[in-house]
Structure formats: C-alpha cells, structure tokens
Amino acid sequence: MYAVVQVRGVVNTRKDIKDTLKMLRLHHINHCVLVADTPENLGMIRKVKDYVAYGEVDAATLETILKTRGRVIGDDPLTDEYIKSNSSTYSSIVEFAQALAKGESRLRDIPGLKPVLRLHPPRKGYKTTKRTFVQGGALGYYGPEINTLLYKMR
C-alpha cells in the first residue's frame, strides 16, 4: 500500500500530468490517497513524481491518519462505531488499518468512506518543494520515511 501526497500545485503544468493527478484523485495540495501496489498505479505515480511525495505506509501510520483525518459522507469523522455498523469483517479502525497495510482490504470495503484524506500542512514545513527527497527536498519517493511525513501532517 502506497500513500501519495500532493506537494505542488498544477498551475502551468502539462495536461497529461493534470490528468494523471485527477485519476489519482489528487485535486489539492496536502491531499493524500492510498493506492494499491500494482504496476498501473506505480506507472501513474512515477509520471507525477515531481508533484507528489509517495512511499510505503505502515499500519500504525494508517491507523493515526484514519482516526484523525478519515471522513465519511456528510463530512463526519470516521469512528469505530461507523466501521462496526457498515462492515461485517472489521470492528475497529485498528483492524481495518492493519488489513489495509497488509493489502487484504481496500478503502471501498467500508461504504461511505471518502477516498481522499485532507491533511494538514506538515509541522515545521516542507524542506523545499522543488527538490527530491534524496536531494533534501519533499518530492518523489520517500520509502518508509513517508510515515514521518504523514505523522507531521496528521
């Protein structure tokens, strides 16, 4: 499971980049989507790597961002009661986050759960939004370090 966070805006960008971000449901800066580890998704992520930060997310971080930023239809917060009443297999956010991290379930297994997480800008800010993570910036592939970025954006 990959977490993809839009870091840069789309003003003066090519149409194919805008279309790919739209297919990933990334319409605004600091929005996050969780995508499965498939060749199709990785191809889309690589295409927009200069506008997003992405990496493998773990179960603890998934649990944190689902508890703090998970929303259902009507903009109500995601709760254990909502998951228990709308899912026959999961009884809490913790169980659902662990299943998501293992790849055993998807976000659409919970009806009414919004697929985009609207995150806060990172505490202490981005390093720079014009360089890759390897060069000391905030763009591109983070690997497991995406968990620290998501924790700052909780």
UniProtKB/Swiss-Prot annotation:
Pfam families: Ribosomal_L30. It comes from the Archaea. The keyword Ribonucleoprotein applies. Keywords: Ribonucleoprotein, Ribosomal protein. PROSITE patterns: RIBOSOMAL_L30. GO terms for molecular function: RNA binding; structural constituent of ribosome. The keyword Ribosomal protein applies. CDD domains: Ribosomal_L7_archeal_euk. GO terms for cellular component: cytosolic large ribosomal subunit. This is Large ribosomal subunit protein uL30. It comes from Methanoregula boonei (strain DSM 21154 / JCM 14090 / 6A8).
